[in-house]
Amino acid sequence: MTDPDLELGVRTQALPRDLTDLYSLLQEASAWPRAQGSTQWNPVYPIERFAQEVEDGHVWYWKLGTAPLATVTLLPRRPDYYPAGVWDDDVPAWHVCRFTVKRTLAGHRVGETLLRQLELDAAGSGLQALRLDAVAANPFLERYYLARGFEDCGTVEIRGERSVLLERRLGVR
């Protein structure tokens, strides 16, 4: 369970006025994998692309008090930087990108709680899967998602790095 003192609130769609705070959260979170020797999020995702995703309505966040505690980008189809043929199917899914929880909340199972909320929201919207990738050089992330019911769907090269594709079929535990 999450820490009972944490009030996670509801997922809120980001607006352009939220860009600075949410991008700061991404920057802060990107330092952790680098400190572990991973190349994930190095360099940090370009702010121009993130701003466009906010503008397109794909970025969401949760707040703790007045500050964002987590953010996620939910794409209705595979990211444009995936190689051709990767998840080119008709399975209705959210492609989970840049799922970030404030590092100061590590150990409180906030990410797990929010991921479960995403699963319920996706299933309630008629989607059949959550899909994501993790840089193979960051085995922590692969283990994290596998432990939460995601399946390894293979390895591909994305933006010059080997990445593991992971999928969580909804309604299956």
Where is each model-derived feature located?
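Conserved acetyl-CoA-binding loop of GNAT-fold acetyltransferases
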Residues: Y145-G154
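Charged catalytic carboxylate motif
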Residues: D18-D21, T113-L114, F140
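A short beta-loop-alpha structural element at the N-terminal edge
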Residues: L8-S24
